[in-house]
UniProtKB/Swiss-Prot annotation:
GO terms for molecular function: lyase activity; metal ion binding. Optimum temperature is around 40 degrees Celsius. Gene3D superfamilies: Divalent-metal-dependent TIM barrel enzymes. This is C-glycoside deglycosidase alpha subunit. It comes from Microbacterium trichothecenolyticum. It catalyses: 3''-dehydroisovitexin = 1,5-anhydro-D-erythro-hex-1-en-3-ulose + apigenin; 3''-dehydroisoorientin = 1,5-anhydro-D-erythro-hex-1-en-3-ulose + luteolin. Heterodimer composed of an alpha subunit (CarB) and a beta subunit (CarC). Keywords: Carbohydrate metabolism, Lyase, Metal-binding. Belongs to the C-glycoside deglycosidase alpha subunit family. Its cofactor is a divalent metal cation. InterPro entries: IolE/XylAMocC-like (IPR050312), Xyl_isomerase-like_sf (IPR036237), Xyl_isomerase-like_TIM-brl (IPR013022). Carbon-carbon bond-cleaving enzyme which participates in the metabolism of C-glycosides. Acts on the C6-glycosylated compounds 3''-dehydroisovitexin (3''-oxo-isovitexin) and 3''-dehydroisoorientin (3''-oxo-homoorientin). Shows weak activity with 3'-dehydromangiferin (3'-oxo-mangiferin).
Length: 368
């Protein structure tokens, strides 16, 4: 029988993007607030949006960053890196260029002290296999993000899982993104549309349309996905709000994934990191559109001892509530869910460091 997991509480600074872009806080200020407000001990950061000149990181800056993390009492969990094969205007990266591009980011993660690099779905099985020895050399686990409109049992994800099994490297795995298993259209986004003048009739039909697709489950293929996207656009147009159509489609099909919680069991042994994506907390102190309690229970029951980075995506549209208050409330739900599952979340720094070190593979003498 699998021992119950004790996930590590954490947050990604992506949750505070509005405050960062509004220059309420710089990177250091956000890190200090994360520690002071008890959102850690786990800390996740996005490389390109947080570190000037990334992935080029000099020794002095890396030293300053590591010292800051130690000073405030956090533990680095995951560095979100990019796998954008379209960085050139006129062509896509070839395989060799992609490996070089990713290698620079893996080295940066190691230099900054991150044990995980979150990579994106544009990385295919051949590339992940080629990157495995590079990840091993630098002691960085590559955790590909399973993000809506993908889901755990999607053919592309299963192909990666099967390749991981073939390669046999403990440095390859997945980042579980809760946005793939959403159970309702986010009420906070409905409120944002209301504030943009959408009629109650239109908003009701948006929710009804999403609920219909939820009952059907994930799209069968890209054609089905495209049809769903188009139906949101058509709905907006019929109600005289074509300006909202693309937004409905992006969120309805690419942010709120309709897979079921149990779908994650398909790749559970390969989940190395978790994005605890959510969109808001209601008046009852619960997340009304993401089954947080069921997701935490599944992780606990599967012996998950890695970090959960609370990832508040509602900042894109919710300008009237504090993201810091919302993160605090959502993490309370996670802790309550872990206790209800017979376990707990790790909030102690020393425990988190020890547990994360045991959870992830390491390479003796790994260096940047």
């Amino acid at each position: 029988m699998t021992a119950l997991g004790t996930p590590i509480q954490g947050v990604t600074l992506y949750s505070f993007t509005r405050a960062f872009h509004g220059r309420e806080y710089d990177l250091e200020g956000l890190i200090r607030k994360t520690a002071a407000d008890g959102f850690g001990p786990g800390l996740e950061i996005i490389g390109f949006s947080s570190f000037r000149g990334f992935p080029a990181i000099d020794d002095a800056y890396a030293g300053w960053f590591r010292d800051l993390i130690d000073e405030v009492g956090l533990v680095t969990t995951s560095l979100a890196v990019n796998a954008d094969i379209g960085i050139h205007r006129d062509r896509l990266l070839n395989q060799d260029e992609l490996i070089e591009y990713m290698t620079l980011q893996i080295k940066a993660a190691a230099k900054l002290g991150f044990p995980i690099a979150r990579v994106q779905i544009s990385i295919e099985p051949d590339s992940m296999e080629a990157l495995a020895p590079i990840a091993e050399a630098h002691g960085v686990t590559l955790a590909l993000e399973v993000h809506a409109d993908q889901y755990a049992s999607h053919p592309r994800i299963l192909a990666l899982r099967d390749r991981y099994e073939k390669v046999g490297s403990p440095f390859l795995g997945f980042t579980m993104d809760w946005g793939a298993t959403v159970s309702g259209f986010a009420p906070s986004l409905i409120e944002a549309y209301r504030r943009r003048g959408a009629s109650e009739e239109l908003l009701g039909q948006v929710v009804d349309l999403w609920n219909t697709y939820y009952e059907q489950g994930p799209p069968a293929d890209q054609a089905d996905h495209g049809q769903r996207f188009g139906s949101f656009i058509g709905l907006a147009a019929r109600h005289g709000r074509p300006d909202l159509g693309i937004d409905f489609g992006i969120n309805g099909t690419g942010l709120f994934g309709p897979a079921r919680v149990d779908d994650w069991r398909t790749i559970a042994p390969w989940i190395k990191h978790v994005h605890g994506k959510f969109f808001g907390i209601d008046e009852n102190g619960e997340e009304p559109s993401v089954p947080v309690r069921d997701l935490v229970k599944l992780l606990v029951e599967n012996g998950y001892n890695g970090a959960i980075s609370s990832e508040y995506e509602g900042w894109h549209w919710n300008y009237w509530q504090s993201p810091f208050d919302i993160i605090s409330d959502e993490q309370a739900v996670q802790r309550s869910a872990a206790e209800a599952a017979g376990s707990r979340m790790i909030t102690d720094l020393a425990e988190a460091r020890t547990q994360l070190g045991a959870w992830l593979p390491n390479t003796e003498g790994a260096h940047a």
